From Swiss-Prot:
It comes from the Bacteria. SUPFAM superfamilies: Putative dsDNA mimic. Signal peptide: none annotated. Pfam families: DUF440. Gene3D superfamilies: dsDNA mimic, putative (3.10.450.140). Belongs to the putative dsDNA mimic protein family. May act as a double-stranded DNA (dsDNA) mimic. Probably regulates the activity of a dsDNA-binding protein. This is Putative double-stranded DNA mimic protein MS1016.
């Protein structure tokens, strides 16, 4: 029997990721990166819902099913509207009753 998963819509995934980012960034990013993000966010900031990568096992050490997670990036975009400075990548479970997440922070 297959369990139907109600996937997060992109806006909900973005909201969850951004809330987590704001809460955890001071503990996980360099102070210079936090200052850069705060100064540039109004003009260049972006929180983007992207296709879930299939290489998260390299980052978190566990195989995941990309269909069961949403991926969101938080960063700054360049003049071509491409995110060229990524501060955090989020992997967020679609399961509302067991909402787990993983974050890869900028080093």
């Amino acid at each position: 029997m297959t369990v139907q998963i109600n996937k997060l819509d992109p806006d909900a995934a973005i909201d969850i990721a951004y809330d987590i980012f704001l809460e955890m960034a001071p503990e996980n990013l360099d102070p210079a990166d936090i200052m850069l993000f705060n100064l540039q966010f109004e003009e260049r900031g972006a929180v983007e819902f992207v296709e879930t990568a299939d290489n998260w096992d390299e980052e978190i050490g566990v195989l995941i099913d990309p269909d069961e997670y949403a991926e969101v990036w938080v960063g700054l975009v360049n003049e071509n509207d491409e995110m060229d400075d990524i501060f955090a990548k989020f992997l967020i479970s679609h399961r509302e009753d067991d909402r787990e997440f993983h974050v890869v922070w900028k080093e």
